[in-house]
């Protein structure tokens, strides 16, 4: 069975008064899972969200799409990640909120075991900027 793992940030883009679920690893996980499940495969996200409304929204969205949420840690102290998107006529920029849950993804034996079963692993770049997640 083909199994992919997407490790890294889960966040909400705050744009024009709306919150849009994203983060490159999660976007990959959702799209790849939809494609792979047709062939008996899956893509599993590994990340960390806050114990807050946005974190609950992430878990509900994964559940509604039949994506495994077993490797999503819930941080009791830090919020779910956000990125404020500022748009202009010609461009847009992102302000990534710091000290959020995904930046403190903790090592777990379950995730290590999962990685041993994976056909491929994708790492998000934002999640690699914190030494806590290395």
Task: Please describe what each predicted stretch is.
Residues 1-19:
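Positively charged, low-complexity intrinsically disordered leader regions
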Residues 6, 22, 74:
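Conserved strand-loop elements at the edges of beta-sheets that form or border functional pockets
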Residues 12-14, 40-125:
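Conserved N-terminal subdomain of the carbohydrate kinase-like
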Residues 20, 49-50, 129:
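Residues that cap or flank secondary-structure elements
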């Amino acid at each position: 069975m083909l199994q992919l793992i997407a490790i890294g940030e889960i966040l909400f883009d705050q744009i024009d008064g709306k919150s849009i679920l994203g983060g490159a690893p999660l976007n990959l996980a959702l799209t790849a899972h939809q494609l792979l499940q047709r062939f008996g495969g899956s893509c599993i996200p590994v990340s960390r969200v806050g114990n807050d409304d946005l974190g609950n929204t992430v878990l509900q969205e994964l559940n509604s799409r039949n994506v495994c949420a077993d490797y999503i840690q819930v941080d009791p102290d830090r919020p779910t990640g956000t990125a404020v998107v500022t748009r202009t006529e010609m461009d847009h920029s992102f302000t990534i909120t710091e000290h959020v849950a995904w930046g403190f993804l903790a090592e777990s034996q379950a995730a290590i075991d999962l990685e041993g079963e994976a056909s491929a692993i994708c790492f998000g770049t934002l999640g690699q900027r914190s030494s806590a997640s290395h």
